[in-house]
């Protein structure tokens, strides 16, 4: 939905590629009641049932959903800083997902797509969300992704919705989601979905 109209509930200071994932993850785990729809803004409609296995408001992690270090979950992790409200793209990839494949035929809706651009010194990792068949304007395709372009001091960036088939021909080869591209790390699934 952020592609069509950014929710006022999405903090403008966190609008980047990983911020889109964090926002979507949190909001997916909330109860989608009348108060939620009012908070999200006009135009939001139900598109999936609530996640019954986890309730953000009552869960042990609260808003601190993102693991920040290696290791299997232990009870003391809830108190020792192993979980945070923030995760950049690298942290999402390293501690919160499992590798699926570089083959797009293995991807499922909700999987994350990671790129690594080592020449970008501050944030070399970039993440996109694979949505598969889009709810609106799918054009009969099932290879849609959404992502935030990132912001700069002069540009707040934007959320884009594009097909993998279009990205396959991106003018900069480093952004092509092809198995032959070493900058394309592949598809990853959130550990919470495993």
Which role does the model predict for each range below?
Residues 3-14, 99-101, 116-118:
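Second-shell loop/turn segments in exported
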Residues 5, 22-33, 115-118:
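Sec-exported extracytoplasmic/periplasmic mature domains
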Residues 10-28:
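Active-site nucleophilic cysteine motif
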Residues 16-17, 22, 43, 47-50:
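Secretory/export targeting leaders with adjacent low-complexity proregions
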Residues 30-34, 136-139:
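Bacterial peptidoglycan biogenesis and beta-lactam-recognition machinery
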Residues 33-42:
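Short acidic alpha-helical/loop segments enriched in Asp/Glu that coordinate divalent cations
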Residues 44-154:
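...with weaker cross-activation on analogous glycine-rich loops/strands in unrelated enzymes
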Residues 140-194:
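Low-complexity, Gly/Ser/Thr/Pro-rich intrinsically disordered linker/tail segments
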């Amino acid at each position: 939905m952020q592609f069509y109209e950014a929710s006022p509930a999405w903090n403008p200071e966190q609008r980047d590629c990983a911020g889109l994932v964090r926002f979507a993850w949190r909001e997916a785990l909330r109860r989608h009641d009348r108060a939620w729809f009012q908070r999200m803004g006009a135009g939001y409609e139900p598109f999936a049932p609530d996640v019954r296995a986890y309730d953000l408001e009552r869960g042990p992690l609260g808003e601190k959903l993102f693991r920040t270090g290696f290791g299997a979950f232990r009870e003391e992790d809830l108190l020792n800083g192993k979980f945070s409200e923030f995760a950049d793209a690298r942290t999402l990839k390293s501690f919160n997902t499992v590798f699926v494949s570089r083959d797009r035929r293995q991807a499922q809706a909700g999987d994350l797509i990671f790129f690594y651009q080592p020449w970008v010194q501050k944030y070399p990792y970039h993440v996109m969300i694979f949505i598969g068949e889009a709810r609106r304007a799918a054009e009969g395709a099932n290879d849609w992704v959404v992502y935030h372009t990132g912001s700069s001091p002069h540009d707040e960036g934007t959320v884009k919705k594009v097909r993998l088939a279009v990205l396959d021909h991106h003018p900069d080869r480093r952004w092509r989601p092809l198995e032959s591209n070493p900058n394309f790390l592949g598809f990853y699934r959130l550990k919470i979905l495993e």
